């Protein structure tokens, strides 16, 4: 177990599930949502046998995937996307902070949804 992290419990699954149920009409937004879903939450819920409480994958929105349809950037990490959106980036050299990353992803999501999709001709070689 990493320093500073407590072991995920059945109670943690219950609390998160209740919270997400209260806001069931809202998406769950993350940058690299597939990683957060599969490597973090799916594993945590599975480890304590509460998989049925995990929110469905259809609720998730990935700001990295969304950014690729809206912005032409050399890289699509959270810092690059924040910069591409003209939003305040995370402080360089600071350790990863999940709460700050979640706030940044939410701001990116809201901003990207105001932008039109790139035209196919703007997508670059990877779409050909």
Where in the sequence are the language-model features?
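Metal-dependent phosphoesterase signature
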Residues: 1-19
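Metal-dependent phosphoesterase core characteristic of DEDDh/y 3'-5' exonuclease domains
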Residues: 1-3, 20-128
């Amino acid at each position: 177990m990493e320093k500073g992290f407590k072991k995920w419990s059945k109670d943690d699954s219950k609390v998160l599930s209740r919270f997400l149920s209260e806001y069931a009409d809202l998406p769950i937004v993350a940058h690299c949502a597939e990683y957060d879903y599969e490597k973090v939450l799916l594993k945590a819920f599975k480890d304590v046998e509460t998989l049925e409480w995990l929110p469905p994958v259809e609720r998730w929105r990935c700001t990295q995937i969304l950014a690729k349809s809206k912005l032409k950037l050399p890289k699509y990490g959270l810092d690059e996307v924040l910069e591409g959106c003209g939003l305040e980036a995370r402080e360089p050299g600071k350790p990863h902070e999940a709460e700050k990353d979640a706030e940044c992803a939410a701001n990116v999501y809201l901003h990207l949804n105001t932008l039109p999709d790139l035209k196919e001709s703007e997508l670059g070689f990877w779409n050909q």
